[in-house]
């Protein structure tokens, strides 16, 4: 029988020998930033030569700006602030490709979570959401991998011509660069997932590997598709985490603590650092 808890005593956690789990989750945060910076360096390099240090600063600056925008849409504009202004249009194309790689990864793992959820808790609404997610994933994949093929069909449309410049720039990316961006997005997603499972373990949430992975996949997908602002996202994260994980544990305080901890580690801390870098950049200019 699973041990059911409704509250967590922080002192007990630190005294129980579980503190290394928290340390490991914290250590993985710089790895997250490093992976995303490496991806940005590869993709942004098509528009302008980018050093790894500059890529790290761009990623942190993007996180800082994303925290005050709906569904973090300000992340990529924030990154462009660190790049040369004359390359802005090219970098917008880079941002578009990076965003598509991120969404392709998100929906791929999200569908795995949805398949698991439908198998465990079948229902009409869950099935409809799964089908819709598969359709959206297919569209994203076609745009990501076959842009050059299908874009020709829309060249005659006046509204599409306004985006022709971005389209031509997107064609400059090689298949290898696209796959590298996609692979790094997937690796970063798995690191996020590992952090969450580590924090849940720290909070004594009993989960099997399959339960933990699939539910975490679904959690990250859900918070990405639900409209929100990062500053107000914490409440949504809490509600989604309780809805998904209450099926495996009654430790509501532990679930919420792990969710809040992940939010602080991967968003708040990098956003603070990024804000300092942005302020410093403005002062230097």
Where does each model-flagged region fall?
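Hydrophobic alpha-helical segments and helix pairs
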Residues: 85-136
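Transmembrane alpha-helix interface/packing and boundary motifs in multi-pass membrane proteins
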Residues: 65-67, 218-236
């Amino acid at each position: 029988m699973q041990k059911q808890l409704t509250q967590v005593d922080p002192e007990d956690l630190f005294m129980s020998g579980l503190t290394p789990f928290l340390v490991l989750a914290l250590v993985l945060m710089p790895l997250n930033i490093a992976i995303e910076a490496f991806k940005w360096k590869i993709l942004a390099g098509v528009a302008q030569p980018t050093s790894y240090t500059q890529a790290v600063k761009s990623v942190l600056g993007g996180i800082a700006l994303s925290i005050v925008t709906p569904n973090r849409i300000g992340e990529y504009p924030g990154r462009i602030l660190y790049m040369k202004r004359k390359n802005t249009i090219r970098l917008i194309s880079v941002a578009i490709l990076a965003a598509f790689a991120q969404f392709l990864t998100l929906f791929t793992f999200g569908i795995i979570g949805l398949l698991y959820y439908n198998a465990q808790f079948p229902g009409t609404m869950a099935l409809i959401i799964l089908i819709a997610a598969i359709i959206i994933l297919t569209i994203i994949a076609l745009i990501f991998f076959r842009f050059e093929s299908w874009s020709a069909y829309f060249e005659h449309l006046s509204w599409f011509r306004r985006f022709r410049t971005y389209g031509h720039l997107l064609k400059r990316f090689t298949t290898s660069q696209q796959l590298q961006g996609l692979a790094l997005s997937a690796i970063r997603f798995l690191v996020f997932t590992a952090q969450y499972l580590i924090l849940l373990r720290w909070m004594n949430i009993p989960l099997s590997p399959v339960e933990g992975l699939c539910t975490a996949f679904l959690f990250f997908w859900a918070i990405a598709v639900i409209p929100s602002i990062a500053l107000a996202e914490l409440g949504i994260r809490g509600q989604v985490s309780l809805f998904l994980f209450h099926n495996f544990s009654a430790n509501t305080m532990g679930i919420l603590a792990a969710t809040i901890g992940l939010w602080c580690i991967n968003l708040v801390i990098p956003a603070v650092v990024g804000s300092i870098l942005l302020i410093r950049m403005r002062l230097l200019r």
